[in-house]
């Protein structure tokens, strides 16, 4: 990148993006099972597509830990549970996207996630005016959360 801001085209419509181990990971959210995640490498001033992976529907956040486990935040709707889906690695996720190693139920409207220092940090959109006040005319969130949820991965993998 030469300037403060650069623009790069990707092959899939981003619903969430993360950077891990020198790779840009871009997932596409669909309510049905046609979701994909594509990995990209930045090389010689260009973003080069590396590989495509199948992922479960409704993915809104991606994170990786030091063991290359994949954490996906999946959510759709203000009154449906969200889930943190955990896979051993990207190959396990690609092979069986509907069969995570572990699945943790969370409140509705989970969005982006981040992994740092043994914790998963989860953002929720349920306290935004659209969901909290129902400004879109589709009702209010049943469980508005205006905090970041922290999940200690030692409670998942003791």
Describe every region a protein language model picked out:
Residues 21-22, 85-102, 114-117, 157:
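Flexible "stalk/tail and boundary" regions
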Residues 103-117, 136-146:
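C-terminal regions of proteins
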Residues 24-27, 69-72, 120-122:
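Conserved beta-propeller blade signature
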Residues 22-66:
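Eukaryotic tandem repeat interaction scaffolds
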Residues 32-40, 78-88, 128-155:
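Structural motif
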Residues 2-8, 46-53, 97-103:
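A short beta-strand motif characteristic of beta-propeller blades
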Residues 7-21, 55-64, 105-116:
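Repeated scaffold domains used in trafficking and secretory/extracellular systems
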Residues 53-94:
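Loop/turn-rich, solvent-exposed surfaces of beta-rich toroidal or solenoidal domains
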């Amino acid at each position: 990148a030469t300037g403060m801001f650069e623009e790069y085209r990707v092959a899939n419509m981003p619903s969430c993006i993360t950077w891990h181990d020198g790779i840009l990971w871009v997932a596409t959210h669909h309510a049905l099972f046609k979701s994909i995640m594509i990995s990209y490498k930045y090389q010689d001033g260009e973003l080069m597509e590396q590989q495509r992976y199948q992922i479960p529907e409704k993915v809104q956040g991606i994170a990786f830990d030091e063991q290359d486990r994949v954490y996906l935040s999946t959510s759709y709707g203000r009154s449906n549970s969200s889930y943190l889906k955990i896979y051993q690695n990207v190959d396990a996720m690609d092979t069986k996207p509907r069969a995570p190693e572990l699945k943790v139920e969370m409140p509705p409207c989970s969005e982006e996630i981040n992994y740092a220092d043994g914790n998963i940090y989860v953002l929720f959109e349920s306290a935004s005016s659209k969901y909290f006040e129902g400004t879109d005319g589709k009702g209010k969130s049943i469980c508005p959360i205006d905090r970041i949820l922290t999940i200690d991965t030692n409670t998942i993998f003791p």
